[in-house]
Amino acid sequence: MVNNNKRKEIENQENDNDDDNDGLLTYKKFKDVDYDSIRSKELQTIAKSLGLPNNGKKQEVYKRIEGYFLSKKVKNDLTNSTTNQPPQLQQKQPQQKQYVLLIKDVDQLEIYFWKAFRNMIIFKNIFSNFKSKQFGYHDLIGINENFLKSYSNSLEIIKDNIKGNINHQIIRSVNDIVNIIKTLKKKDNETISFYTTLFSTFSSSSSTTTTMQSTKSLIFQFDENIDLWIQRMILNENLVALDQFIKFFKINSDVLKKSIEMHINPSFFNVFSYNNLKIYNYLKSINAIPTSHIKQRFSNIDLSESLSFDYKFKRLIKSYKLLVDPTKFKEIREIHQQQQQQQQQQQQQQQQQQQEQQKQQEQKQQQQEQEQQQQQQQQQQQQQQQQQEQQQQQEQQQQEQQQEQEQQQQQQQEEQQQEQQQQQQQQQQQQEQQEQEQQQQQQQQQQQQQQQQQQQQQQQQQQQQQQQQQQQQQQQQQQQQQQQQQQQQQQQQQQREGRQLQILDYIEKLDQLILELNEIQFSHFTDDQLNSTIKNLLNQTKTTTTTPILITNNNNCSDLKDIIKKYYKSIYLFLKIIEEGKHDRNLMRPFHYYLYFKKKMNVSQLYEIFCGFFIKKYDDCLIFFKSILIDQQLERNQRLELVSKILDIENGVSFQNIGSNFNFTSFNSFCRVVFSTNDTELIDHLIKTIKKLQLAQNSKTQFPSISYIISINFQYINKNEIVDFFFENYRNETTLFDDQNQNWNNNHVNIIDHIEKIMESIGKKLQLYFVKYSNWFTNGNKNNEKKYNVNILLDQLKRAISKPLLYSFFFDSGYYCNTTLLNIFGWSLENGNEVVINFFLPNEIFKQPFRFSDIIYGAPSPNKIPNLIKLIFNNISKESIEPKLYQVKGNFNIPHLYYGRDDFIPLTSTISTTNSEEVGQFIIGETKSFDFIISPRMLFICLYYLDRFEDIFYLFDKIPEIFSSTYFPNFTKESYLYNICSSYYLELLINYFIENLNDNTINHLYNCLCVASGKGFTQIFKNILSSNKNSQSLLKVRTKTNQSSLFQLNFLCGMVLKSIDSSNFQLSNLLIDSIDFPPKNKRVLNQKYLVHLIINK
């Protein structure tokens, strides 16, 4: 491993409680490192020195190093706590105990049994008679969910594997443990004991043997990555594993908090689910929730799913106890009381502020008015002064003009007297007159300028007035805005007060409910009640008259139904309080809550609530429509009106989804309920209403045809009168009475009898669509209702077969017919009803050969496949198979991708018919033969399932061409053998190929060895190594000097890589050490092995 010496030095000398370890990086020192200042290369160097992968981003490497130190801290704390224990508390070395049999009177036969059972020779002789060696303990490969769910004793198998150190194939990597954590979550003593054993075995403090310890070190150790295992257990919501993990390694809250901060997103705890609440409450109870991860509010609340009425009653009680925490509720109540007090104080402060604001506004208005008045007065004074100045100037000008005129008159008089003297001066006077005219013009201009100035002053006054008006308008707008803001604030305040009052009302109601429910304990209910679904319990309270449990509280009694309602109401109120209306739509109660508990609501109100649920499941729709059409016991007119209202697409939304087309789920369930009423008038009203609405339908409201509606719902009719009604009124609008129609299926014998009579009277046949029955016989149909329907369908099939003049069969194609037959056979074997197979196979209708090649991938469960094969191949011998193989022998060398018709072998088998008679343990009666075709590959698989390997080898010897490289690899190819072959038979094949080596069998031998390597069958390779001849030919590199070996270097490297890729580390070590690889190739394989080992840790 990378820099192992440095890592061991740190592991041996590191002590987190000692700060004097200069030169060594401790957890405390690493925590002091500034993440922003340290460079990525430095972190990579530290990771490399610790033997950790140093690839990835800076944050990934940092978390990897921090996780390493957290794990070291847990190891040191665990070692110190064990060392510091008083001697009397430390574990004592186990001493050999003498076991005493407590039962005194033991039957003599039992003593003989145990003597024989413990005798190895007798034991092996007895169990050698058990032929089935397909799968054994050594064939269990890894751990997946199928393994954990398929085997009821899966826990015990894993325990035995861990304790016995058997093959190290069940737990081979981290992924195997993760699959365990994903699956095993049930809290019981068995699971708790299992996890304790698991953690004890795969930890550095384990006291197991040296061999086991070395094997474990090849896989992983839990305390190497404490933080990552905490992350995996929390994310997979496995509380049992997490609790035992914390207790076993004595992990303190600081380590848990740090691990959660490193690897868990805070939003993970905001999910509203049952398991998430369990994990969160547990971590909170041990003070392991970081501040950043404290649940503030739920990110998504879907009560219709999380509080479904399909869950068990005890889960509802546990959900209530997990969610409605009295301590948290007390804190919430105190918080809301404080908020109410704060709101009252805020109201008083707001009122004072409003009063002060009003006073300030009034003062501002007064000041503004005074300023405006002053400005107006000043403007008036200025105007008056300007006018006075202008008048004075005009008066002066007038006086000057008068003086000038008087002077001019005097001068004229003198001129008249002295005409002769003034003639010489006339030119001068004319000039003076011109000057006077100019002066007059100037005066006029001055007057015009004065007028313009006056106009400008008037305009300025108007502008000032407009500005004043605008200011007044702005002030008014500001006042209006302030008033609107005040109104909005008042409305918001009223809403807050209303919500606060509503929440306080919720708190009072919830407080009362908590007091009532605190008196209820699990012991008050029976186990049947606790393990029953809520829906079943509520249905029982309707139909039964058994005495319900009574809980007395303040002289108030409540039955089981009322208790269930209180649990739901308490959870709903609690979520309303903590969410404060943030998720009103998701906080809608499950629809069944309204059906069972809101009896005061009328049908219209229930219908409106139902339309508000966008996700409508078929069963929920059935319950709703049944409750309003049948359980409500409405009068005839009310039922007719209700049908019309539900079908009214324009006013209702029951059959529409937003953004999608017609909702057939709710419509089909509605029609089913109407037909189930067997009310002729109601059914007729439904059909006629749909016909009217079809005239105005569009792409989103397109109803199915009337023929489809009648045909698909005919199965729910149980009265002959309804059949006659359809025949008389809708014969031309439905295919129900057409010749060769397939719509006659019904679950009631009287209806089938009646329609048979009608069809016989009109001279027409019914048709049975055989392929349509296929899905009814698959393993998916597990509930009782469908099992009942399967029995009815089988009766219908038998009826049709027994009446060939009235029924015809439609097979569609041979493939689907064969699939349906196989599904029927699989169902028959699953339910122990092999008589059905005896009825169908020899029948003339199914006489054509059917294809058997899809049986492995068909309907029967894997553990039932051998039974079906045994039933069909019971009378087929190897001698009868041999000539059939010779017939297709010529095709073995023809390359092809898919098998054609010529590649299938026709075979014939016999089976007892239903006419046989049982006599004791034997069946005496008529036997009939039936034909089928099968590919050679599938033939060998069937022989393999029947433990008939001797027959396979017999056919190999008789027909060597079967080993052709173009054909036989389809059976011995690696991927196929990996899925079906056990270690026992795989070793048989390997030995057979070794004894019969040729150019073809070498390829098959290599495939088998690759399968053994990939599966981790270490014992097969140990057996090969124990034989010098086999080891030299199989596990040595073929070179020019070593021609005795079969495989070249690249083939052997590929075989080793199979074990590395499959995490078979023990086998990988064995093969790398045993095969004579060149140093370069051995180095490459070791590097790949180490990289894969680090990744899996």
From Swiss-Prot:
Domain SAP: 35-69
SMART domains referenced in this protein's UniProt entry, alphabetically: SAP (SM00513)
Keyword field: Coiled coil, DNA-binding
Annotated stretches, region: Disordered: 1-24
Alphabetized PROSITE patterns for the sequence: SAP
Stretches with biased composition (Acidic residues): 12-22
Coiled-coil annotated spans: 329-521
Protein name from the UniProt record: UPF0746 protein DDB_G0281095
Taxonomy, superkingdom: Eukaryota
InterPro entries to which the protein is assigned, alphabetical: SAP_dom, UPF0746_actin_org
Biased composition (Basic and acidic residues): 1-11
Entry's Gene Ontology molecular function annotations: DNA binding
Family designation: Belongs to the UPF0746 family.
